[in-house]
Swiss-Prot record:
EC annotation from Swiss-Prot or TrEMBL: 3.1.3.16
Annotated compartments: Nucleus
Record function comment: Protein phosphatase that catalyzes the dephosphorylation of the C-terminal domain of RNA polymerase II. Plays a role in RNA processing and termination.
Protein's name according to its UniProt entry: RNA polymerase II subunit A C-terminal domain phosphatase SSU72 like protein 1
GO CC list: mRNA cleavage and polyadenylation specificity factor complex
Family to which this protein belongs: Belongs to the SSU72 phosphatase family.
InterPro entries the record matches: Ptyr_pPase_sf, RNA_pol_II_suA
Species of provenance: Homo sapiens (Human)
Gene Ontology MF terms in the entry: RNA polymerase II CTD heptapeptide repeat phosphatase activity
Signal peptide: none
Amino acid sequence: MLSSTLRVAVVCVSNVNRSMEAHSILRRKGLSVRSFGTESHVRLPGPRPNRPVVYDFATTYKEMYNDLLRKDRERYTRNGILHILGRNERIKPGPERFQECTDFFDVIFTCEESVYDTVVEDLCSREQQTFQPVHVINMEIQDTLEDATLGAFLICEICQCLQQSDDMEDNLEELLLQMEEKAGKSFLHTVCFY
């Protein structure tokens, strides 16, 4: 493997639900993990489907929580957003954009194809410094509480297998094929370089 501890990133659109659920589970399992979003703003479900509540990425989870509490406590309790923001606040202060991160990872998981495309494009646009490989893996995860949890456990299982692998580079493709069969999901996978 590339390092003694697998360095993992999980990326979704807003760094609120899917990436943070995976962050929570991977952290509890003792893995080195960070989570990110890729959009220009954090968008949460609003009063109507076409009217999201929009926050800047500099807004903390606590500020979002308090704002939604003031706006409509019942709605945001019922749809689970207050629960999600409370969990997130216990993990880190606020959302982060992947494009602003300069840390190196061994594996980056994305939660939808558009996020995968953004991450790969960003990595390819950076000047290569160390030529260290980073595996970018996309797993389609619907942006619901249940699917985020199921996806997070699958990401965790993959990470644990990679952590135990003698040679991640040689074993990753085979592992992804096994996981595709087991989970009934297909993965996109590419290698970029730092």
